[in-house]
C-alpha cells in the first residue's frame, strides 16, 4: 500500500497549473474512539494510509479551484467541525450538505457502522462554493440531498454520487483521494488508478466484484 510522502507537493506535481470547476474529496481522516480500535490507521486495520488534519488543511486545493467552483467534501459525522475547517482552508464557503444513508440489501438501515454515542448509518457530503454566481445547475434544484445505497468496501463511497455531481455541477472535474479512475474526471490519490481493487476482507459487493459482474 502506498502512502503520502508530501501530499501537497504531490498534488501540485500532478495537477498544478490546471483549474477545476468541481472538486470531490474524500480525505483519509484520522479519528478513533477511546479504545483506538475503529481508527483506519489502527495497526490491525491497515486498510489505507491517513493524513493528519494539518496535512489535509495544507493541501493546495485553493490553487486548483476555478472561480466559480463547487466542492463536495466527504466528512464522517464525528468530524463535522474539522470538515468545515478544511472547507474554509481550501477557499470555499459552506452552503449545505448531502446525506448518504447506508442500507442493507432489503433496504433497511445497515447497522454495521461504528459510533461511540450512536450506531452510524449515515455519512455527510459538505457542499461549498467559491466565487460569485456559483449556484448548482438546473438539475440541482430538483435533486434531494439524500442518497440511500448499500455499502461497498471500507470507506468506499457510492458511485451514484458521481451522477449527482455531474448533473448538478459543471466540469472540469477533479477527485481527490480517488479509488480508481473515472471517465471525464482527473483523479489524484494513492489508490487512483485503473487497477484499484480492495486487498482486505470486505463486503461481497466491493469494487472488484462489481467490475467482474459488469464484464461477465
Task: Set out the residue ranges of the language-model regions.
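Class I S-adenosyl-L-methionine-dependent methyltransferase catalytic core
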Residues: 1-216
